């Protein structure tokens, strides 16, 4: 799940979020003077962003202490300039301007974020964050079969074993090794990060860093909407969770997987349990209807990493959207280098100059990376579409929008109709059993992710708001993972352990509810684009959301381009309404997409007598803390 220029998001988020330009009709001298002021300041801001992202990219693609220090120096220097700009705006009357665009720019440029800290505190914060990132990027673990070989990295070595091993002891070994190496040593850095972000938030007039993050959604009710949305989706997740637990018990036996309770994360094929589709062979509803092995077909046809990106580029061009510029191909890092450490977590980068956009990821040729490539190219297309906006508006009006754009393209790309069109499968229309299999496969990532995405920031909100004592930081994390998602660590964890930093986004200070929101918005976007493309009609069995492919639709492309080009210049509800006809985050489209599978799960679980739900985990001390139910 790549984020936009994730590594330097802490600095950028304080200035970067709301975007757009609606100049109004006023021509008063004060308005003209303000417009000139913001025109000049946006150019300076653009140059600072270029410098920041360049230093961040250099560090991410060559993780050395020298590059880390160089990046921090750039951040610190520009933080002082950002602080001066914010103070200048606050001392003016721009926030009360008669011109709506001036007010919007003034409001967002006066949000300082971490730059509000004094120079020493700012450097300490950046050191804490970058130290966590460095540890994550360089952590290695010992092999289960050869304990003297301690050179295994998360990608590809550990993930390959989590995906393919069916030995519970081996899976638990790699889970514990990774968390012990990438998480526990970072507790002091995380505590420093919490202390300093709390201080920065108070200097910005917020009670906590959680409230600072929430305000970027420009809706005082948005947190409540997230809670309500999660509750709407929980019945579907409970059916899926119960079915998977039942099938795991069939495979591993009752000693490894009891009939009820939480599922050990190590059995789910992903380090964090945020996606379970690597274990599809254990869960497939109709195994006599085998899935097409897209990876095998890619290998047969000689696919390369370059080919994956070319296909993504062609998809956007087929919509009449922008082609990738030559600099993308020359300057991106698309595979893992052999001669240096890199942060392999996929991310897309906007350098705020001359359409310079890049991707950094350790790509391999398989169906997972086929999806990730399109996701990251969605970020890239967003950058290209709004690059004409002033720097303050070069971003998404809702943090969830940026993450949703790549995913909405991937929904078309991974459809049977599209896979047939590009020659990876022979049949572009699935029979009912194959359709259930396909929806099930998608649910193992799209639906399974929701409790994880929800818990990551519910946990950090509790930490930031001091609702969770520092003596309970680790057990509180696992209590939330259990309570919201019914998963648990494979081994007992105490406060001597510290597992949250074993996830990249926590190390990198990336607000995470954007991914939860994106998983809802992408289906709203998908439905709107499928209508534009003539690929969807309600109650039409031949034009369903789950087999819609907008490839080649100029009408869909125009609609998407108009939506993206506004950047953050206007409130997200306004641009969402123009794009989809809706004004709120609404899971109805997601539930419609998966409705056939939901009905199948309810019937199958009832037939099999599958128990649903779970109780508290027993893998943490029993006196940890109270429940967190929303």
UniProtKB/Swiss-Prot annotation:
Its cofactor is Zn(2+). Residues 28-615 form the Peptidase M2 domain. Its main location: secreted. GO terms for biological process: heart development; heart morphogenesis; positive regulation of circadian sleep/wake cycle, sleep; proteolysis; regulation of heart rate. Coiled coil: none annotated. It comes from the Eukaryota. SUPFAM superfamilies: Metalloproteases ('zincins'), catalytic domain (SSF55486). The active site is at residues 376, 505. One of its GO terms (cellular component) is extracellular space. Disulfide bonds join 142-150, 344-362, 530-548. Its EC number is 3.4.15.1. Inhibited by captopril, lisinopril, trandolaprilat, fosinoprilat and enalaprilat. Disruption phenotype: Defective heart morphogenesis leading to lethality. GO terms for molecular function: carboxypeptidase activity; metalloendopeptidase activity; metallopeptidase activity; peptidyl-dipeptidase activity; zinc ion binding. Keywords: Carboxypeptidase, Disulfide bond, Glycoprotein, Hydrolase, Metal-binding, Metalloprotease, Protease, Secreted, Signal, Zinc. Binds 1 zinc ion per subunit. Residues 1-22 form the signal peptide. Zn(2+) binds at residues 375, 379, 403. May be involved in the specific maturation or degradation of a number of bioactive peptides. May have a role in the specification of heart progenitors. This is Angiotensin-converting enzyme-related protein. It comes from Drosophila melanogaster (Fruit fly).
């Amino acid at each position: 799940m790549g984020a936009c220029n994730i590594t330097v998001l802490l600095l950028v988020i304080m200035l970067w979020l709301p975007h757009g330009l609606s100049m109004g009709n006023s021509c008063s001298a004060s308005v003209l003077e303000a417009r000139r002021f913001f025109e000049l300041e946006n150019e300076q801001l653009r140059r600072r962003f270029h410098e920041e992202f360049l230093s961040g990219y250099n560090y991410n693609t060559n993780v050395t202490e020298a590059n880390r220090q160089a990046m921090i120096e750039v951040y610190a220097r520009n933080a002082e300039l950002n602080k001066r700009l914010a103070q200048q705006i606050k001392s003016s009357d721009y926030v009360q301007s008669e011109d709506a665009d001036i007010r919007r720019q003034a409001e967002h440029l006066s949000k300082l974020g971490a730059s509000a800290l004094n120079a020493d505190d700012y450097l300490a914060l950046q050191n804490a964050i970058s130290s966590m990132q460095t540890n994550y990027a360089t952590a290695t673990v010992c092999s289960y079969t050869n304990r003297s070989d301690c050179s295994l990295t998360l990608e590809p070595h550990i993930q390959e074993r989590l995906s393919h091993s069916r030995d519970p002891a081996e899976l638990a070994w790699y889970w514990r090794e990774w968390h012990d190496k990438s998480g526990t040593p970072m507790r002091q850095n995380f505590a420093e990060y919490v202390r300093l972000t709390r201080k920065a938030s108070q200097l910005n007039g917020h009670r906590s860093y959680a409230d600072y993050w929430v305000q970027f959604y420009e809706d005082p009710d948005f947190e409540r909407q997230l809670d309500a949305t999660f509750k709407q989706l929980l019945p579907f997740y409970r059916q899926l969770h119960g079915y998977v637990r039942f099938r795991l018990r069939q495979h591993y036996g009752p000693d490894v997987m009891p009939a009820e309770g939480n599922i050990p994360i190590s059995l789910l094929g992903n380090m964090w349990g945020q996606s379970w589709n690597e274990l599809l062979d254990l869960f497939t509803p109709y195994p006599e209807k085998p899935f097409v092995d897209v990876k095998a077909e890619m290998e047969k046809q000689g696919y390369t990493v370059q080919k994956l990106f070319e296909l993504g580029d062609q998809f956007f061009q087929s919509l009449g959207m922008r082609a990738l510029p030559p600099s993308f191909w020359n300057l991106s890092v698309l595979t893992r280098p052999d001669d240096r450490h890199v942060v392999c977590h996929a991310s897309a980068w906007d350098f705020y100059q001359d359409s310079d956009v890049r991707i950094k990821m350790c790509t391999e040729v398989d169906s997972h990376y086929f999806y990730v490539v399109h996701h990251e190219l969605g970020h890239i297309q967003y950058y290209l579409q709004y690059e004409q906006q002033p720097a303050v508006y070069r971003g998404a009006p809702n943090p969830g929008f940026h993450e949703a754009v790549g995913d909405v393209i991937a929904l078309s790309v991974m459809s049977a109709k599209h896979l047939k069109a590009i020659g990876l499968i022979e049949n572009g229309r699935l029979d009912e059993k194959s359709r259930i299999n396909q929806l099930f496969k998608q649910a193992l990532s799209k639906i399974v992710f929701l409790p994880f995405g929800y818990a990551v920031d519910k946990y950090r909100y509790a930490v930031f708001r001091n609702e969770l004592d520092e003596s309970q930081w680790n057990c509180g994390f696992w209590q939330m993972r259990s309570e919201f998602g019914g998963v648990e660590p494979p081994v007992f964890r105490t406060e001597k352990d510290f597992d949250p930093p074993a996830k990249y986004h926590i190390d990198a200070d990336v607000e995470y509810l954007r991914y939860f929101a994106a998983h809802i918005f992408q289906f709203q976007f998908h439905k709107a684009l499928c209508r534009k493309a003539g690929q969807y009609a309600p109650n039409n069995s031949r034009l369903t959301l789950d087999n819609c492919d907008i490839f080649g639709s100029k009408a869909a492309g125009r609609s998407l381009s108009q939506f993206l080009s506004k950047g953050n210049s206007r409130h997200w509800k306004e641009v969402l309404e123009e794009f989809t006809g809706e004004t709120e985050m609404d899971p109805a489209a997601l539930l419609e997409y998966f409705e056939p599978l939901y009905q199948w799960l309810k019937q199958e679980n009832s037939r099999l007598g599958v128990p649903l739900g779970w109780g508290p985990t027993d893998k943490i001390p029993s006196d940890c803390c109270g429940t967190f139910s929303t």
